[in-house]
Amino acid sequence: MSGNKVEVDKRRTFAIISHPDAGKTTITEKVLLFGNALQKAGTVKGKKSGQHAKSDWMEMEKDRGISITTSVMQFPYGGALVNLLDTPGHEDFSEDTYRTLTAVDSCLMVIDSAKGVEDRTIKLMEVTRLRDTPIVTFMNKLDRDIRDPIDLMDEVENVLNIACAPITWPIGSGKEFKGVYHILRDEVVLYQSGMGHTIQERRVIEGINNPDLDKAIGSYAADLRDEMELVRGASNEFDHAAFLKGELTPVFFGTALGNFGVDHILDGIVEWAPKPLPRESDTRVIMPDEEKFTGFVFKIQANMDPKHRDRVAFMRVCSGRYEQGMKMHHVRIGKDVNVSDALTFMAGDRERAEEAYPGDIIGLHNHGTIRIGDTFTQGEKFRFTGVPNFAPEMFRRIRLRDPLKQKQLLKGLVQLSEEGAVQVFRPLDTNDLIVGAVGVLQFEVVVGRLKSEYNVEAIYEGISVSTARWVYCKDERKLEEFRRKCSQNLALDGGDNLTYIAPTMVNLNLSMERYPDIEFAKTREH
């Protein structure tokens, strides 16, 4: 038991959230560099400047499917063992991105300091709110001209509704960027750009009133002292309890491209971020230091190579210890399975897992029996909660080139929806099939997989659907009346749950006003 507790206490499991182009890929790489997880030789190719260097296993090669190793990286740092879960950006954005956030204990939010809070960040923060996930903030790109730091923090507070506590404070920006003042340590760290894989030795001046500071940065020292008077008066002090409740975020400034400030973030995560947390189930709360193994599946990644129908189910370990060859109980189907070939992810290598502890992520080979949200135990029958389906944001009607294959199409879509690749809706009043997704890439993936795995050729057509909501009502009679009057807007999803398909947001809002007893839900438990 005590061995387990030691391992649990070491773990920190977090994800990085940001708007595309805020620097997430760079920061992921630099976090691995500071964690010594990025091997210096053989893994980096890029222009001589190193600016475009990208480790091979982070290149998302769509033509052969996204390499599984992009998803989980584990490395030691400061006496802890850090699990970093990547959330795909850009067009790879999908429901997976949202669901990954249900498997972590904290998040690092990266903001482009020239732009401030952007819409993708707002959406991702809404998801972290479902579980009050603690958030660490990094204001990136200080080597460029940025917006006023106090304005940036005000925007985070107002738009994202979370208090900000600055931990480091920038001295200048762009060409005049001199470094940061670490408020809690009362020290100035001078900026020296370390590009690519060079981590410069820290130049630190102890104390804001140290005369050496004036020698090093001239008039910027006096400006910093004045500014700190203002900042101390106007901003929040760091409060660990408020951070753990998701009410306050510690804010760091730096430049990931210049390898500066990343170590401050990692120090903060190791010192303050929660170790693996207890998890709710439908019967009780599962504590991480329990002896028996438990875990849940939050993501299924299909290998898009048709020769290998290898799908990997990503499982977050919640309690106990995974050992190679152990027997697990797959609760939903009521079967025991022997797991001898689970994968672990150490610095981008796909290795067979010898063991794994709470907070770790392991990959199970899945031949179609595992679904998102599935719980695995050592025999106990319960289901972990908190792995939701999210209302899609994009919709297409899907149509067959060969109308005789309707049955295969429906079967394929239902199976893909169980896996979480896409959501499917069957309107009550028509024979249409509507596919819903969070990101464009999901549509492409589905057509490709229908063809390779189900031998079905399908095409998409536009459809005037703006959003979807799952519909619930405690009063069976009122639900039946609603179903009768609004049938032209109702559909069943892949799991036969009643769903309201709204052509416009105005239509949805009117229906919500007209039927106050009906709940229109944005998320649904798996």
UniProtKB/Swiss-Prot annotation:
A Gene Ontology BP annotation from the UniProt entry: regulation of translational termination
tr-type G domain residues: 9-277
Disulfide topology: none
Family matches, as InterPro entries: EF-G-like_DII, EFG_III/V, G_TR_CS, P-loop_NTPase, PrfC, RF3_C, RF3_dom_3_sf, RF3_GTP-bd
Binding sites annotated in the UniProt record for GTP: 18-25, 86-90, 140-143
Main location: cytoplasm
Summary of the function given for this chain in its UniProt record: Increases the formation of ribosomal termination complexes and stimulates activities of RF-1 and RF-2. It binds guanine nucleotides and has strong preference for UGA stop codons. It may interact directly with the ribosome. The stimulation of RF-1 and RF-2 is significantly reduced by GTP and GDP, but not by GMP.
Name this protein carries in UniProt: Peptide chain release factor 3
